[in-house]
Amino acid sequence: MISSGVLEYIKTLKEQGVVRHIGMSSHSPETVQRALDLGLIEMLMFSINPGYDYRKGEYAIGSVDERMELYRRCEKEGVGISVMKAFSGGQLLDAKTSPFKKALTRYQCIQYALDKPGVVTVLPGVRNREDLRDLLGFFDASPEERDYSVLGTFTPQEAEGICVYCNHCQPCPGGLDVGLINKYYDLSRAGDELAKDHY
């Protein structure tokens, strides 16, 4: 895009007020990091789901650490992430196709994505009105219906020791919200000033 002149053209359109915001879509943390280094994007469409975050699936590009580092950087730099592939093309919703061999619900997948740093919205695929009605039910779903802590019972071995803020380890004997503490810690390590105040 840089050598072709497309980026310069988009920048010109933004300066003229024709383009209000510049965003991009990618499945690769490395590609997005390079775009962030240019300081031009304000929005990112990125594939986030438990399968991809744990290197399971066609678009599972980058390690868990690389992906989390990208989410944290986007949050720190004010680049909103719109999530695509939240259900991994439906694979996570069926035990037969799930890389975990257990099905998750749509609500669990949506909440999982929303809980990642930098995420501002999830764009689930809608095929018909029934899908739309079901997805809108997320807004009325109970915390139990959104809870994805079951992931802690079947995530791959490579994920051990990496907190994904699911609170599967709860209840803490000391009454601490372990997921939230780890989230603030991760944000603080990434340089988020607000998180440092909380941590």
For each of these PLM feature ranges, what is it?
Residues 65-199:
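Structured C-terminal cap/extension of enzyme domains
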Residues 1-82, 87:
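Glycine/proline-rich, positively charged
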